[in-house]
A protein has these predicted regions:
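Divalent metal-coordination and catalytic microenvironments
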Residues: 5, 17, 58-61, 87, ...
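Active-site metal-binding loops of divalent metal-dependent hydrolases
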Residues: 6, 30-31, 62, 88, ...
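Catalytic core of the metallo-beta-lactamase
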Residues: 37-128, 140-144
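Short hydrophobic beta-strand that contains or immediately precedes a catalytic carboxylate
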Residues: 58, 224-230, 235
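Divalent-metal (often Zn2+) His-rich catalytic cores of metallo-beta-lactamase-fold enzymes
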Residues: 75-83, 104-105, 109-203
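A short, well-structured juxtamembrane/interface segment
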Residues: 205-219
């Protein structure tokens, strides 16, 4: 399985999928994950059937980010068919450089890397190359994401505000200003995706322990709020009408 970067807005299922299927995890060579993975250097590739998947190091949204260029070898061994851009290039936007700024690198440095990744790598692909990003509208990883799920390099070159002709400094100034505040859990999720941690199955088994009525009343007396998360239909079926 391929991870383009360490997502910040959700905990990925790569460790669980690896545990259940034995599938190996592929990450950018600079990922530095604590679990075993196949490091993908720039332009390294993996072939399966008629498909060749080549890695491009595209840091900027995150330091370790990669994009995956897909070749349909039944059509051409040298002309890209599509590219999975992760959170580097969205439809209508590019990835925020501030979410993963950490010790040793800041949002300005990541924004500079993002500009270089876009202009020196992704925009060098043919205009007809299909673009499949990791997110659509609604994600906090960008501020102008489209509801569309696929585009082309050519369409993004002409329509994406962040890809219009400008200097690197102009791009950095634009992309580092006016970003909405990121939720506090983003940094936690990103760290979790980089390290070995209990799977969802293990977490649920350890966490979902039933409470007795007396325990609930005790918690309530100390300020705990009980939230009923049942579906309205289930609630109605269980409700005792007096």
């Amino acid at each position: 399985m391929f991870l383009t970067h360490f997502h910040a807005d959700f905990v990925a299922g790569h460790l669980e999928l690896h545990e259940q299927t034995g599938a190996r995890i592929c990450l950018g060579a600079k990922a530095g994950a604590s679990y075993q993975f196949i490091p993908l250097e720039n332009e390294s590739h993996i072939e399966f059937g008629n498909v060749r998947m080549a890695a491009l190091e595209t840091p900027g949204h995150t330091p370790e980010g990669i994009s995956l260029v897909v070749y349909d070898m039944s059509q051409s061994r040298t002309k890209p068919y599509a590219v999975f851009t992760g959170d580097t290039l969205f439809i209508g936007d590019v990835g925020r450089p501030d979410l993963m700024a950490s010790v040793g690198i800041n949002d300005v440095e990541l924004a500079e890397k993002l500009y270089q990744s876009l202009h020196q790598k992704l925009l060098k692909l043919p205009d007809e190359t299909l673009v499949y990003p990791a997110h659509g509208a609604g994600s906090m990883c960008g501020r102008n994401l489209s509801t569309e799920t696929v585009s082309t390099i050519g369409m993004q070159r002409s329509e994406n505000y962040a890809l219009q002709p400008m200097s690197q400094q102009e791009f950095v100034d634009m992309i580092t200003q006016g970003q909405p505040e990121a939720p506090a859990y983003f940094a936690y999720d990103a760290r979790l995706n980089k390290t070995e941690h209990p799977t969802l199955t293990e977490t649920l088994h350890q966490s979902l322990n039933p409470l007795s009525l007396n325990e609930i009343l005790d918690h309530q007396s100390r300020g705990m709020q009980v939230v009923d998360v049942r579906d309205p239909v289930d609630y109605e079926l269980s409700l005792i009408h007096i």
